[in-house]
């Protein structure tokens, strides 16, 4: 008992006190003696703690942009011989370039801190891979940090999250921000050396780290006696090439390092000389750098303030006599190459476009026509070098600026007159006008495929050029997931225009056509519409080309969740099944990706396209709270966000790429019904593999898509379709039940429609309230063939067996509540012991609930998921209760229990341990008189799962061939009763038939085969051979939970006893004068109580309520309680508490479990009587 109290006190200290370290040190030996529970090894395997350095090495893409080779990338490099920039294909590991860039930008940043800096040197040794960066100007202070107790350079270069840039109230125009920088280079290096001179105190500092910053030598600090030595800083490192999957520095890597050195030489002020391997970089400022891309005669250069240097050129241009297509964006912020642009590029580009647009519009000759901004932007190449105050970037790789324009710290004033003159003289205006006019002309000469063929497809927004010979290939059909996604796409067309983009919304999921022929597929309305919209024909399956279609490309706009991935897959499968050549054409099918969630803090906004990407970021994000908004459905995005997405189409579009027959095999495996065994193996494999979430790729093979996004859908689909062995529930059922258990008592009634809304809100459910309504109703149905132990009460019309429950009343008119047996199945004492899930930052339902009997065997289940299906029949609750009793008593349970359905009057026959025959009930009513002319047949029960209305359709066809004199139905709400009166002479053969023959003739027999597939306690899919195996696994989990419950109950009883004892002792000491309340302050009293062995509030401690874990329960007692009468009451309460503790100490899991089983069995019996 004493140890447990110490442990609770330790937990309190950890959460509230700065004395944590001391407490931990003093109690380490005690903690080591605490026995592990049965969950310890499982928890250790599942949860790991990594140091910051280990996390950087384990997840490098979060910090440095990835270590894998990026192949065949088009990069503009310097041609030193001809003094110009040229586009070249290179292959390189981006992370290696990033760690070099961190050191280079650090050196360049020193110019902003010390204007006297005038030299930066980079040395690169190809053979040893040793790189050094040296700069003059003020070095780092060579002093001991007063708080950390180590030298400042050691702190800055060898400890993550250290920076001089954290104070956002101080205006800075440097590249560093988050305290990673040079430390990342240190972590990814075999050797890392820092040397700096601080002439203020005449000290030189040198320190060496190695083995990925895991080890370092002592800092060498020497006094400088030479007065001529100036301040400098030098960083020298040898990158750990193995971590970048290379063994030496390739020509491409060396060229890219040289490019960055050259870029810094161009972006730094002109008074800073930059050298590479002793050779001065031959560039005279940013304007000179821009001229290396383009003839200076066709270049506009704007330099309104020292913080803004902007070059503008036509994208299609000439360098001398050579035609070149210039890069769309070349931009730098505080010497950082922002390769993907960002808010600074948008800011400058919009100002330039606003000047050029009116000029173009005036020359079009038609006041009703206007050039789209996107057309102008596509004709411009823009070069920017700017200084931004305290910049924010999309990620640590700093490729995209996210700072809002109002926070730039300066304004770019675009010279309108100079810009307009340049646009005219360079021929830009003429080029744009010609392009716009040609667009219009292209509508006329081509022959249009019949427009009337699609005019009746009401929801189609057809592209203006769709079906026109010569232009249709350029058209893209955006296929959206429903009407809300269509609205998003239409907002995007404001940016893209309607000439080449059409939109068509799909009604949910497309049909899986894998096992359909042309005729059957074309009968589907959705597929028929797509054939007409796209201009597809089944007979052209081998010869069809993009040029022959109405649209040359498909762009799928679906939700960013798993169901969205499934929709993409079904569309891919549709095209692949009938026109594989189109799938083999790269770029015919594209996917549009939107953020799954956004994080916002002040002006900063971060977008994430997958939970994996978000988690990596969240793991390392430091400081401040971010507001998270989830975009589970496309309808969540606003029209402004839609325009933002479509303005950056390249970033939001993913091309499907065909890489060979493995892609064909992957598509067939995912969708062909004959490939179920392969899908099972695929799913098994996925449980042990990390799937490829959207990692920012703009191109993906079909196999990557199947093994990544589709695999994730498969796992989610299985979890929706197949229940947990532990509670017998699927996720939606569990969310519904937990909402009621956690928020309402058994007597509370709630409208079904309101309950669905509450579940969606409280349990983070995103699949529509209609789906929840259907599940709630099923959970409350009591007719034969539904649940043996319904978890909810059906208050109102929840449907009957005649329609299989589909005749339930509207959710607005019916109510529900917990069924009387539900709390007996799920004891409230377990609620706080269950492991809760967290979704969207909110604590929701547990991973599984834990009933006192395996509910899956009582209520059964049925479900079909990806690759796997499950079917388990209902069984008698009393039989299952008896089986668990036998296991408690260690009596063998290696036997099968036959299926059982409440109120079923037919027969269930066992064929094999997993196969059963369900027979209805038929009665031959023989005539009482020998000469009677008629006799009757009555059908009074149907096989399990056969509903009355469906059977009536079948029966009607049977009796059509019989001499029926009368056919009547006498059903009640719960009973089936068909009566057929036949002519005796014409139907005498029936009088000779056995009951078995009659059952067969009237199709009153069905087979039921069990396929016992369930998720186990760890969430892994498992197939069980018999129900004893299911019961055995359930038993272990339930027993462990009882032991955990009893342990906690004992601790609570101890806490209650200590609470009363302490109050009693306190009152006694106050009344006898041992404690003088009046002469001491609160702090003195608390210290006194601690010295005397009083505990802080034991009830608050065990409840982990740190705010109340103090001495308030003693010191804040009213004076009226400090009496002998109160002491008597407390003595009585103490006696009761001691009795409760003794009962808790003597209780064992077997007796508690038996007691709860008895109560459940009694309730089941009472239900049957009623």
Curated annotation (Swiss-Prot):
Biological process per Gene Ontology, one example term: resolution of meiotic recombination intermediates
E.C. number: 5.6.2.2
Uppermost EC category: isomerase
Cofactor, free-text remark: Binds two Mg(2+) per subunit. The magnesium ions form salt bridges with both the protein and the DNA. Can also accept other divalent metal cations, such as Mn(2+) or Ca(2+).
Cofactor (UniProt): Mg(2+); Mn(2+); Ca(2+)
Predominant location: mitochondrion
InterPro entries: DNA_Topoisomerase_II, HATPase_C_sf, Ribosomal_Su5_D2-typ_SF, Ribsml_uS5_D2-typ_fold_subgr, Topo_IIA, Topo_IIA-like_dom_sf, Topo_IIA_A/C_ab, Topo_IIA_A_a_sf
GO MF annotation terms: ATP binding; DNA binding; DNA topoisomerase type II (double strand cut, ATP-hydrolyzing) activity; metal ion binding
Subunit-level organization: Homodimer.
Protein name: Putative DNA topoisomerase 2, mitochondrial
Native source species: Caenorhabditis elegans
């Amino acid at each position: 008992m004493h140890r447990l109290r110490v442990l609770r006190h330790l937990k309190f200290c950890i959460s509230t006190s700065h004395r944590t370290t001391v407490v931990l040190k003093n109690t380490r030996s005690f903690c080591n003696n605490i026995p592990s529970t049965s969950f310890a090894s499982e928890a250790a395997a599942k949860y790991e703690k990594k140091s910051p350095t280990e996390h950087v090495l384990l997840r490098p893409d979060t910090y440095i942009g990835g270590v894998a080779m990026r192949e065949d990338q088009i990069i503009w490099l310097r041609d030193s011989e001809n003094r110009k920039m040229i586009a070249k294909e290179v292959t390189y590991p981006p992370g290696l370039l990033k760690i070099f860039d961190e050191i280079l930008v650090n050196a360049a940043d020193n110019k902003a801190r010390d204007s006297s800096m005038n030299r930066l040197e980079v040395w690169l040794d190809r053979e040893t891979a040793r790189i050094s960066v040296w700069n003059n100007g003020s070095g780092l202070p060579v002093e001991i940090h007063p708080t950390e107790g180590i030298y400042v350079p050691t702190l800055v270069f060898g400890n993550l999250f250290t920076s001089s840039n954290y104070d956002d109230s101080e205006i800075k125009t440097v590249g560093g921000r988050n305290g990673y920088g040079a430390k990342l280079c240190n972590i990814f290096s075999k050797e890392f050396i820092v040397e700096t001179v601080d002439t203020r105190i005449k000290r030189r500092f040198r320190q060496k780290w190695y083995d990925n910053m895991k080890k370092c030598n002592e800092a060498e600090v020497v006094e400088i006696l030479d007065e001529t030595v100036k301040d400098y800083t030098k960083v020298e490192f040898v990158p750990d090439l193995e971590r970048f999957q290379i063994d030496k520095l390739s020509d491409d890597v060396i060229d890219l390092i040289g490019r960055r050195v050259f870029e810094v030489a161009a972006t730094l002020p002109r008074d800073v000389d930059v050298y590479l391997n002793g050779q001065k970089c031959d560039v005279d400022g940013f304007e000179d750098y821009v001229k290396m891309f383009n003839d200076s005669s066709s270049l506009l250069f704007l330099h309104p303030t020292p913080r803004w240097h902007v070059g503008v050129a036509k994208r299609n241009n000439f360098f001398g006599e050579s035609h070149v297509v210039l890069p769309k964006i070349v931009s730098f912020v505080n010497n950082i190459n922002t390769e993907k642009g960002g808010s600074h590029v948008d800011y400058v580009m919009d100002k330039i476009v606003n000047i050029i647009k009116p000029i173009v519009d005036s020359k079009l000759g038609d006041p009703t026509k206007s050039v789209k901004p996107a057309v102008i932007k596509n004709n411009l190449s823009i070069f920017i070098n700017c200084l931004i105050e305290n910049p924010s970037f999309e990620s640590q790789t700093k490729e995209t600026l996210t700072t809002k324009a109002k926070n730039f710290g300066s304004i770019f004033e675009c010279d309108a007159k100079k810009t307009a003159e340049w646009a005219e003289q360079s021929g830009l205006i003429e080029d744009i006008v010609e392009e716009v006019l040609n667009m219009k002309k292209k509508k006329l000469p081509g022959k249009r495929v019949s427009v009337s063929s699609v005019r009746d497809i009401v929801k189609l927004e057809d592209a203006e050029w769709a079906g026109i010979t010569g232009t249709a290939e350029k058209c893209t059909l955006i296929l959206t997931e429903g009407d809300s996604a269509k609205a998003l796409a239409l907002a995007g067309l404001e940016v893209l225009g309607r000439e080449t983009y059409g939109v068509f919304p799909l009604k949910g999921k497309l049909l899986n056509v894998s096992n359909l022929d042309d005729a059957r597929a074309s009968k589907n309305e959705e597929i028929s519409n797509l054939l007409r919209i796209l201009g597809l024909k089944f007979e052209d399956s081998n010869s069809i080309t993009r040029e022959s279609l109405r649209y040359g490309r498909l762009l799928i706009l679906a939700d960013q969740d798993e169901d969205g991935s499934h929709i993409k897959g079904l569309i891919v499968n549709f095209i692949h099944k009938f026109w594989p050549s189109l799938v083999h054409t790269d770029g015919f099918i594209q996917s549009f990706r939107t953020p799954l969630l956004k994080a916002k803090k002040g002006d900063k906004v971060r977008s994430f396209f997958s939970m994996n990407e978000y988690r990596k970021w969240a793991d390392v994000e430091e400081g401040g709270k971010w507001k998270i908004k989830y975009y589970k459905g496309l309808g969540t995005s606003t029209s402004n966000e839609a325009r933002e997405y479509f303005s950056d189409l390249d970033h939001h579009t993913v091309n499907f790429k065909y890489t060979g027959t493995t892609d064909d095999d992957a598509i067939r495996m995912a969708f062909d019904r004959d490939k179920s065994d392969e899908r099972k193996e695929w799913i098994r494999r996925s449980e042990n593999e990390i799937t490829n979430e959207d990692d920012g790729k703009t191109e993906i093979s079909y196999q990557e898509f199947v093994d990544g996004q589709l695999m994730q859908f498969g796992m989610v689909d299985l979890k929706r379709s197949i229940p947990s062995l532990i509670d017998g529930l699927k996720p939606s059922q569990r969310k519904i039940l937990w909402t009621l258990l956690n928020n309402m008592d058994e007597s509370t009634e709630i409208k079904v429609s309101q309950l669905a809304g509450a579940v969606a809100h409280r349990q983070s459910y995103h699949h529509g309230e209609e789906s929840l309504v259907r599940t709630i109703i099923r959970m409350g149905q009591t007719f034969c063939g539904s649940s043996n132990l319904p978890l909810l009460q059906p208050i109102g019309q929840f449907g009957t067996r005649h329609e299989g429950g589909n005749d339930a009343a509207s959710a607005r008119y019916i109510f529900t509540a917990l069924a009387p047996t539900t709390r007996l199945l799920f004891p409230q004492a377990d609620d706080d012991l269950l492991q809760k899930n967290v979704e969207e930052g909110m604590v929701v339902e547990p991973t599984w609930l834990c009933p006192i009997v395996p509910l899956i065997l009582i209520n059964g289940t049925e479900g079909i998921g990806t690759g796997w299906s499950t079917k388990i029949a209902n069984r008698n609750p009393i039989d299952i209760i008896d089986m668990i009793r036998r296991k408690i008593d260690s009596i063998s349970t290696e036997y099968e229990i036959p299926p059982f359905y409440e109120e079923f009057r037919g027969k269930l026959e066992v064929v094999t341990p997993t196969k059963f025959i369900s027979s209805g009930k038929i009665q031959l009513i023989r005539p009482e008189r020998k000469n009677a002319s008629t006799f009757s047949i009555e059908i009074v029960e149907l096989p399990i799962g056969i509903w009355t209305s469906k059977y009536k359709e079948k029966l009607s066809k049977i009796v059509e061939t019989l001499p029926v004199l009368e056919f009547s139905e006498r059903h009640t709400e719960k009973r089936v009763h068909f009566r057929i009166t036949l002519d005796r002479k014409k139907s005498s053969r029936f009088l000779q038939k056995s009951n078995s023959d009659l059952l067969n003739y009237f199709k009153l027999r069905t087979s039921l085969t069990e396929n016992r597939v369930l998720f186990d306690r760890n969430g892994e899919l498992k197939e069980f051979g018999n129900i004893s195996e299911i019961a055995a696994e359930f038993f272990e989990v339930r027993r462990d939970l009882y032991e955990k419950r009893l342990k906690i109950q004992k601790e609570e009883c101890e806490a209650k006893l200590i609470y009363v004892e302490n109050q009693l002792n306190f009152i006694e000491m106050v009344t006898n004068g041992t404690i003088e309340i009046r002469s001491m302050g609160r702090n003195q009293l608390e210290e006194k109580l601690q010295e005397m062995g009083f505990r802080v509030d034991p009830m608050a401690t065990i409840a982990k309520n740190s705010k109340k874990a103090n001495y308030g329960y003693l010191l804040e007692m009213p004076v009226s309680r400090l009496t002998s009468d109160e002491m008597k009451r407390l003595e009585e309460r103490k006696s009761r508490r001691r009795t409760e503790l003794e009962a808790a100490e003597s209780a064992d899991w077997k007796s508690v479990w038996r007691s709860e089983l008895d109560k459940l069995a009694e309730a089941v019996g009472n239900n049957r009587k009623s």
